[in-house]
């Protein structure tokens, strides 16, 4: 059975059929208007979580280069506010994954498309994002031997679809083929 999730703009879908487990439903729990799970609407979440044999991939998708994107020229993925918001999605989603028993090492992947985006700007975003994720924390706490996070990547859709591991979960235009 095919397992595909469509991103919030309805223009791209990710095929998670090859995953051991996956979800796009963390948001449903965190933003429950009836507060069934507590008053936790302040929590942020990644768009997709994908379990591989070795990792849990926490995937955040932002595409300011699609037709109809609101003010793409104003989108600045390197701003302090944007970086902190994206990093918060990793931390907040980790709680839900822990409760689900998904305790494999994490990889945070930020799929980022925007008008001025290129591999150099994505690398700069990655380096700034890495400073906000728990890499330093886990390296300074000795004697435990556990990791919260193994890697962070900031990739374009094309880079996602050509990555040796990530291409197993193709990201494609709805009704089309990968670009």
Name each model feature, range by range.
Residues 64-115:
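Catalytic cores of nucleic-acid endonucleases
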Residues 107, 111-164:
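Short, low-complexity, polybasic intrinsically disordered segments
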Residues 48-50, 55-65:
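Conserved catalytic cores of phosphodiester-cleaving nucleases, focusing on short active-site segments
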Residues 41-50, 81-87:
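Short, mixed-charge, low-aromatic patches
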